[in-house]
């Protein structure tokens, strides 16, 4: 809305997450100088996960975050993945993962202790589908820089991202 653009234009400087976010702001009338964040820093008291541990867990995908807002999780649970396990970290609410052998709920971890995350890959995903990031939250990944990307990198995990997300490049 134009009121938001007016607020942005009254600032001295804007820090945008990504180039697509910067371009969206410009396309919608922001005249204030914009710099790019590129990626969040992430503090961890732990070292990278040992490479041998990551390689040994090549068939385990980590997803960390607010599981209650992750609308794709029911579809992920229902889809049988042969030889692949998803290690979920975060607040789960009333979701019951116990009847899905490829889903492992690992609880909540302390954010500054990335060494307690176990898996071979980190997943950056949103929306209600497992084949594409759709809906409002999924579409936002076209512009957003999710903090979980920095978490996975701080843990030493390679990441899986949607090909159309702002962080795919």
Language-model region placement:
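Hydrophobic/aromatic beta-strand patches that form the interior of the parallel beta-sheet core
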Residues: 15, 35-37, 87, 123, ...
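Short, polar loop motifs at secondary-structure junctions
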Residues: 18-22, 88-96, 108-110, 128, ...
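P-loop/Walker A phosphate-binding loop and immediately adjacent motor/lid segment at beta-alpha junctions
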Residues: 28-41, 157
């Amino acid at each position: 809305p134009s009121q938001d653009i007016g607020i942005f234009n009254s600032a001295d400087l804007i820090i945008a997450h990504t180039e697509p976010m910067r371009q969206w702001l410009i396309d919608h009338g922001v005249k204030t100088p914009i710099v790019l964040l590129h990626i969040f820093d992430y503090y961890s008291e732990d070292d990278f996960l040992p490479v041998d541990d990551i390689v040994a867990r090549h068939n385990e995908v980590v997803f960390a975050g607010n599981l209650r807002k992750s609308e794709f999780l029911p579809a992920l649970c229902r889809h049988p993945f042969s030889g692949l396990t998803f290690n979920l970290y975060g607040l789960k609410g009333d979701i019951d993962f116990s009847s899905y052998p490829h889903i492992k709920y690992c609880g909540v971890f302390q954010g500054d202790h990335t060494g307690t995350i176990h898996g071979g890959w980190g997943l950056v995903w949103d929306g209600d589908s497992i084949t594409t990031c759709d809906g409002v939250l999924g579409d936002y990944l076209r512009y957003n820089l999710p903090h979980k990307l920095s978490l996975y990198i701080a843990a030493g995990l390679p990441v899986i991202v949607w090909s159309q997300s702002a962080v795919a490049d």
